[in-house]
Amino acid sequence: MEGAGGANDKKKISSERRKEKSRDAARSRRSKESEVFYELAHQLPLPHNVSSHLDKASVMRLTISYLRVRKLLDAGDLDIEDEMKAQMNCFYLKALDGFVMVLTDDGDMIYISDNVNKYMGLTQFELTGHSVFDFTHPCDHEEMREMLTHRNGLVKKGKEQNTQRSFFLRMKCTLTSRGRTMNIKSATWKVLHCTGHIHVYDTNSNQSQCGYKKPPMTCLVLICEPIPHPSNIEIPLDSKTFLSRHSLDMKFSYCDERITELMGYEPEELLGRSIYEYYHALDSDHLTKTHHDMFTKGQVTTGQYRMLAKRGGYVWIETQATVIYNTKNSQPQCIVCVNYVVSGIIQHDLIFSLQQTECVLKPVESSDMKMTQLFTKVESEDTSSLFDKLKKEPDALTLLAPAAGDTIISLDFGSNDTETDDQQLEEVPLYNDVMLPSSNEKLQNINLAMSPLPASETPKPLRSSADPALNQEVALKLEPNPESLELSFTMPQIQDQPASPSDGSTRQSSPEPNSPSEYCFDVDSDMVNEFKLELVEKLFAEDTEAKNPFSTQDTDLDLEMLAPYIPMDDDFQLRSFDQLSPLENSSTSPQSASTNTVFQPTQMQKPPIATVTTTATSDELKTVTKDGMEDIKILIAFPSPPHVPKEPPCATTSPYSDTGSRTASPNRAGKGVIEQTEKSHPRSPNVLSVALSQRTTAPEEELNPKILALQNAQRKRKIEHDGSLFQAVGIGTLLQQPDDRATTTSLSWKRVKGCKSSEQNGMEQKTIILIPSDLACRLLGQSMDESGLPQLTSYDCEVNAPIQGSRNLLQGEELLRALDQVN
């Protein structure tokens, strides 16, 4: 029993020795291992205080990472660093807005810069050697693997494989908003903008001892830039940066006012507009993908892109966009952008979108327009305030009136004596055929006859309160000077040319007037002057050869545009009347009636009548009656159209401005009215006479040279407001009675004014009485076949005039007898 107990004790002692030896061997082994790790840790390029506290796993992790980095560095062609480069190395990381990270193709972080602690809260030694997938968001792992993959397959000819990488990565961050460090288990996700490239290292030592070649080493070199939250921006924004807030559809809801200085936009005009309207077209695809990442990961930075300026061109901008979430339901609420403008406006004269054309199309108010508005204000301003406004612009001070005591220098617009008459005539303001008197003596001597008004008669102003259409500016231009009671007009001196050799005898009917004053007739209350026929014919005739320089202006100036304005309410309306007694006895009178009987005064008891008195020598009247009234003609006669509205809106207008005027203005006949109508045979002594004629065709009859002159006349333009030639020259519209198949016509008369002319010896005084338009229409309105007379418009008067001459017209006593019967 004792032997068995001693053996057991020996076994226990041997086992304890073995355990002790094992513990000593393990202790020795650990100590040797620790010595090895200690020596290895001290071999790492780490500070002593860091390397002395590293565990074995960290030493192994860091050593492996270090060996890989050394392998990468040995594969490259590295230059020997000089002292200057060594000193600059410490500034590189400070210049970066992020940290540097090198990943293997497996995702291991073989190198990370020591400033990662500043941005992520994690130290360099905590991350080096670890897999990047241990610190990144699980939703980003797939994208991360795609970025690490380098395809070694065949590449199309002419193209290189893209090795550039740019993506957004969410990584764990242990930093709080206050800058404190938290536990890794409580870390939040921070978005990093990672940009870099894949680098392939092909070393010479890839050939192993076994004979196979190792693949080249591939790594991804990245610069990771964290995107700051707008609420955590500590650095003040400079003048080249502006803030903006957008809705989830990227429409502006707020914009900083600094955008006005940078791009020209006003913050108010951007509200409600989509940011996509202001992107350059070439950057829209890139920005669309960036906004996709923003809604997925919460934050993005766009990189540099082009944004259109307001007035053309674009600027380069880099934007940091952040999605703001609602604190209650964690739903996205809006987007806040920090925009950094990195350039000025480029190609400012180039238009890229319709928004940039709005400012081009909008009129810009110039300084001249402001000055005009300043003087056209209705309310009167104080002179001192006006001076204060104008003194800011020195050129505008010339518009102020001189102060009291200043010397006023009168402006002399007279011409020098060395100027020719033709140069002076170009400066003469012509108002149709009526011209205000000129102060220049030379102009008065160039065939300009002045017809003074009597001292007892003062010309009435052209302004009329009853006529609102009368322009004040026109009235001021046409109103005669109160200091000068003289009016003058110019008329080309013409010579009648015979239409054929057989018409040569008609040129001796009357001497040619020497001055325009012979065209004027004085209207006396006694109606004792007689009417000069030939002068009236020449008044409305125009010759091709002029005797003074004024005739050269007939084709250059639109004189009718400068004629005195006549309100329409001064004339009589065309109206339709009931049927009166027929004029059957008035159509069969002979043509050889005496001219004197035509001008006999007719006793009328109707109120106001217009009288025209003229003077003519007895020799002239004898010449007129020589050929049996051949020279007495109807200048204008109108057939009535079959269908005319009863009440046309147009009204004839008088060519004279006022009843106080005493100067007749001769107007030239226009081709727009005469070219189809003035081929008739002369039958009437005056264009102011009333006649009833029958329409016949006589191509074999000879044409009077006086009517030829009227036929060939050309007028510049038609009178506005449906006015015809007869309204312009003051010719009373005439009534023509055609054959049985023609309809009768009723037209209104014009009031005619005359001016005083010098009396001649041996004159006989005759008087012609012109009946007002209403009375004449009532007297002549009845027809034999019609129940009423249709109204005539100016178009009917101009188009439906007779082409050939008229025969068998009522003359002299027959005409007056017909008028008496109607009365």
From Swiss-Prot:
The modification N6-acetyllysine is found at residues 532, 706. Residues 85-158, 228-298 form the PAS domain. It is found in: Cytoplasm; Nucleus. SUPFAM superfamilies: HLH, helix-loop-helix DNA-binding domain (SSF47459), PYP-like sensor domain (PAS domain) (SSF55785). The keyword Calcium does not apply. The modification 4-hydroxyproline is found at residues 402, 564. Interacts with the ARNT; forms a heterodimer that binds core DNA sequence 5'-TACGTG-3' within the hypoxia response element (HRE) of target gene promoters. Interacts with COPS5; the interaction increases the transcriptional activity of HIF1A through increased stability. Interacts with EP300 (via TAZ-type 1 domains); the interaction is stimulated in response to hypoxia and inhibited by CITED2. Interacts with CREBBP (via TAZ-type 1 domains). Interacts with NCOA1, NCOA2, APEX1 and HSP90. This is Hypoxia-inducible factor 1-alpha.
